[in-house]
Amino acid sequence: MSRIEKMSILGVRSFGIEDKDKQIITFFSPLTILVGPNGAGKTTIIECLKYICTGDFPPGTKGNTFVHDPKVAQETDVRAQIRLQFRDVNGELIAVQRSMVCTQKSKKTEFKTLEGVITRTKHGEKVSLSSKCAEIDREMISSLGVSKAVLNNVIFCHQEDSNWPLSEGKALKQKFDEIFSATRYIKALETLRQVRQTQGQKVKEYQMELKYLKQYKEKACEIRDQITSKEAQLTSSKEIVKSYENELDPLKNRLKEIEHNLSKIMKLDNEIKALDSRKKQMEKDNSELEEKMEKVFQGTDEQLNDLYHNHQRTVREKERKLVDCHRELEKLNKESRLLNQEKSELLVEQGRLQLQADRHQEHIRARDSLIQSLATQLELDGFERGPFSERQIKNFHKLVRERQEGEAKTANQLMNDFAEKETLKQKQIDEIRDKKTGLGRIIELKSEILSKKQNELKNVKYELQQLEGSSDRILELDQELIKAERELSKAEKNSNVETLKMEVISLQNEKADLDRTLRKLDQEMEQLNHHTTTRTQMEMLTKDKADKDEQIRKIKSRHSDELTSLLGYFPNKKQLEDWLHSKSKEINQTRDRLAKLNKELASSEQNKNHINNELKRKEEQLSSYEDKLFDVCGSQDFESDLDRLKEEIEKSSKQRAMLAGATAVYSQFITQLTDENQSCCPVCQRVFQTEAELQEVISDLQSKLRLAPDKLKSTESELKKKEKRRDEMLGLVPMRQSIIDLKEKEIPELRNKLQNVNRDIQRLKNDIEEQETLLGTIMPEEESAKVCLTDVTIMERFQMELKDVERKIAQQAAKLQGIDLDRTVQQVNQEKQEKQHKLDTVSSKIELNRKLIQDQQEQIQHLKSTTNELKSEKLQISTNLQRRQQLEEQTVELSTEVQSLYREIKDAKEQVSPLETTLEKFQQEKEELINKKNTSNKIAQDKLNDIKEKVKNIHGYMKDIENYIQDGKDDYKKQKETELNKVIAQLSECEKHKEKINEDMRLMRQDIDTQKIQERWLQDNLTLRKRNEELKEVEEERKQHLKEMGQMQVLQMKSEHQKLEENIDNIKRNHNLALGRQKGYEEEIIHFKKELREPQFRDAEEKYREMMIVMRTTELVNKDLDIYYKTLDQAIMKFHSMKMEEINKIIRDLWRSTYRGQDIEYIEIRSDADENVSASDKRRNYNYRVVMLKGDTALDMRGRCSAGQKVLASLIIRLALAETFCLNCGIIALDEPTTNLDRENIESLAHALVEIIKSRSQQRNFQLLVITHDEDFVELLGRSEYVEKFYRIKKNIDQCSEIVKCSVSSLGFNVH
């Protein structure tokens, strides 16, 4: 059991904050009494115990009022510390420390808990561990061996909460639930109930899922069977396709070879036709070209080429000169651009220089204006009007410098005067301050000495106070030492360690027997569980057999009518497959016919599309040709338009020739008419009658001569256009022939073919519709039979599985034969629990005996330690008594020194006050002097700075003016203006030269145009001769193609080609049908495999088996949970009733031995089950109340009892709860237990407490703490042999709580 040994308190409530104020209390066993007046700090000790154990603050405080008030201590920070030394449930020594700090802020106090420390002593070594508050709380509850609720409400119950057993119902229920730990067990039951409900729901879900998994498993088996069948059919189909492909390859190769040869023949035929057309066109072109030419050159080709090349050289020479002129013109243009660029740059530079000149004049005006302004400000004569010469400006600068120096000198003199006055004033201030500082140091020094002397005096008085009771304490120590030695001897004599050890050995043997029995029960449980699995499997198999019988019946009833209508009877799988095979063969034949018709229809549709496309292409081609012809001709009458254009070209050629010779003729006529000897017309030889008539003819000829070159140029241009149009129309001659062929032959033939193909398509569609109708009748029968085949296959598989299940049922039945199953799992489990309970009881007894052995050994060790501590304390007190006389003399001496220091400090403070007044006056005078100095200095500096700024601006303008003159900007400006005029003159000369070159180029172009007419005639001759050569080559090539074509056997190739196409079509038709079947099989296999890969069919059998196992296991788990729930519920009820019975028994005994009234026989706690809980809610709740009984009548005490009865009842209930629940912790604290009790009940309470102590005196760990102000009550307790010392709580001269240990005998002396 755990027990507390020592506790120290510092800085808590009224306990002091200095180290010397730390109070230490050692707790006695079995009784510790704390006595003191109200407000002395008794309850604080209980609050400290509760805080150190649970971390909870007293009611009504959050911690800041729990710590010593900083305002009272006159400190900013106050630290509080509580240390407790105790032994845990294992007897190990533990020390716990909790610290707090309270900081005084401006308006409120701030509280903070510091990190706690736990120190354990193991093997003679101390191990410390810093922990957070929550961790310390858990560690304390674990070490003390009781719950936090018991610590708060039973062991260390605060005085304000001491009457909680008679509080209102809800609060009372909460307290009792926490003490009984009922909340945890109720939550455990609720969790079990919820888990059981969840598991039951899961079983239903598993059953539903199992139903679907079974269907998926059966469907997956059916799909696998179908895949196997289709894969066999696919293999056969692939072999047929392969044979067709082997036949087809050599025929395709031969057909390709023949088609290549036919293509070659077709190409030769097309080339011959093209050459014929080309030859005809070339002959026609040559004839037209000869007609267009005025005459044909009769010389050799060499002569024609020489003449043409010489003419070209002449033209090229003239063109070269034209290029040279153009190059010269480009050069002049480039030179003009450069001059224009230079002109622009010079204009920009001229503008920039003009701007600088304007700015220069502006700077001169600004400088003169600033000089006039500053001269006026400084009252300088001779500077009233500008502009100013250089000599005037130098004189101005000299005068300004003199004025600046004078102003600066005046300002410096004024500052020096002020500095002397300030130094004098500071000297006076320093003298006063030195005197004041000296007095301050004296006061501070004397105060420090005073403080030290006061502390020394306080410590000496404290030591004397501690030594006051030392003489009595030595006598007490002698008595305590004799008693301790007597108790040690008695404990060693009464020790029964050996007997307890023998009892432990006996209990260990009994425990070993129980362990063996439990192992046997475990083996029996395992065997029963194994047979339970066998029975479960038997049930599953029987259920599976019934399911399969039902499935077979359903399949037969579902398809019986349908199969009978198709076959005339209900077939088995093989019979149905044979019928399906014959029906499938019929369907395939129909499909083959349908595929052949579809292929023919597709071929006809393709042929129709081809004819439509060809017809559309021919019509578009015709439309395009007609549009092109119309764009060139302007009408559709191509031949007449071409003849008319040729006539116009001929006329234009003649006109061109006439105009070409007109210039020479008109010139000759004019020469003849102007000749004085010639006065008649050169053409008609008519004589002119008058000179005016002659001049009129000359003028007309001259006019025509001037217009002739332009008319020639216009005529040549028109002629070129017409020739170009003629060439274009000649190029369209083949297109015109194509238009005629398209209209008269090709398009009508294609339209006839299209009508024939449409008739074939309609016939094929009728045949296809007939076959599809037949197929639509057969296929539903096949599909219906296939659906039935699936279920028939499943039915046969069910029949096979049914045989297997019947075999397994027989095997499981054989396993269960000869097995005795009278004992169930529940019976064995019940017996196992009983044995386990006995084993736990024996283990607890062993542990208790070991604990008693350990307690007796520790008690003897503790008594030895107590004896040694008393001897050591006696020696220490004897030593301290020898210093008493010395301390009294020291007290008198220190008191005298303190009084003297008080007087000296007071005198010094009286001298400081007049010095402070004088110092303040001198400082104010100095401040005024500094302000005047700063003001005067600012005025002088502002004036000087203004002059400097204006002089600086004048210098800036002067610098800019000098830089302009030194850089020669004015001369540079004039130079740039001269350069600009020169560039403008050069630009004008360049433009004149360009005009002359343009005129020369115009004359050259006219001459070259005249030469081009002769060049065209020579070119036409060369073209004609070249075309004649090409015509000969075309004739030769045509003859060669005819010869090559005659060597090929065209008719035999076409016949063979037709036969090959027919053979290939037949094979392809069969091949396509085979491929269609193959593709159908592949698609069905892929479909089945894809379906098998779907989540519901993948691993369907494994999922079904696993789900069956999970469902059965969950059902067994749910049964176990139900058993455990009921067992736990019964255990909770049994524990609750047993504890309540035990508590009420103790309460009755204590009440009867304590209460002296006759109105109440005894009291007890009633716990009633909650009657308002619904039937569906199986959670158990208890409502608690305290009742008082008189005879057979029970009344609620709450609201009916007196204040004294209420206190006594609460106290007795706490004592009963402590005795019941504090098995590992024998501590209980009673704070003012005599409140509201009369003398008779106080005496009976003291008697009852003594009896409790007596009954628990064998437990060395039992500790009762009693806090009271009633010294009579203490004296009553002191009459027992268990109380020799008690603690008196009082306040010292500093109003801090102190704990003083006193003897009970002295209390009795004082009382009486």
UniProtKB/Swiss-Prot annotation:
Cofactor(s) of this protein: Zn(2+)
Post-translational modification comment from the UniProt entry: Phosphorylation at Ser-635 by ATM in response to DNA damage is required for double-strand break (DSB) repair.
Residues that coordinate or bind ATP: 13, 38-39, 41-44, 67, 69, 159
GO biological process: chromosome organization involved in meiotic cell cycle; DNA damage response; DNA double-strand break processing; DNA recombination; DNA repair; DNA strand resection involved in replication fork processing; double-strand break repair; double-strand break repair via homologous recombination
Record-stated family: Belongs to the SMC family. RAD50 subfamily.
Gene: RAD50
Annotated disease: Nijmegen breakage syndrome-like disorder: A disorder similar to Nijmegen breakage syndrome and characterized by chromosomal instability, radiation sensitivity, microcephaly, growth retardation, short stature and bird-like face. Immunodeficiency is absent.
Enzyme class name: hydrolase
Binding site for Zn(2+): 681, 684
Domain notes: The zinc-hook, which separates the large intramolecular coiled coil regions, contains 2 Cys residues that coordinate one molecule of zinc with the help of the 2 Cys residues of the zinc-hook of another RAD50 molecule, thereby forming a V-shaped homodimer. The two heads of the homodimer, which constitute the ATP-binding domain, interact with the MRE11 homodimer.
N6-acetyllysine: residues bearing it: 959
Coiled-coil ranges per UniProt: 228-359, 401-598, 635-673, 706-734, 789-1079
Residues recorded with modification Phosphoserine: 635
Record key words, sorted: Acetylation, ATP-binding, Cell cycle, Chromosome, Coiled coil, DNA damage, DNA repair, Host-virus interaction, Hydrolase, Magnesium, Meiosis, Metal-binding, Nucleotide-binding, Nucleus, Phosphoprotein, Telomere, Zinc
Binding site for Mg(2+): 43, 159
Effect in UniProt of substituting residue 42 to N: Abolishes ability to degrade ATP
Gene3D superfamilies for this protein: P-loop containing nucleotide triphosphate hydrolases
GO MF annotation list: ATP binding; ATP hydrolysis activity; DNA binding; double-stranded telomeric DNA binding; G-quadruplex DNA binding; identical protein binding; metal ion binding; protein serine/threonine kinase activator activity
Designated name of the protein: DNA repair protein RAD50
Quaternary context: Component of the MRN complex composed of two heterodimers RAD50 and MRE11 associated with a single NBN. The MRN complexes dimerize on DNA to form joined MRN-MRN oligomers required for DNA double-strand break repair. As part of the MRN complex, interacts with MCM8 and MCM9; the interaction recruits the complex to DNA repair sites. Component of the BASC complex, at least composed of BRCA1, MSH2, MSH6, MLH1, ATM, BLM, RAD50, MRE11 and NBN. Found in a complex with TERF2. Interacts with RINT1. Interacts with BRCA1 via its N-terminal domain. Interacts with DCLRE1C/Artemis. Interacts with MRNIP.
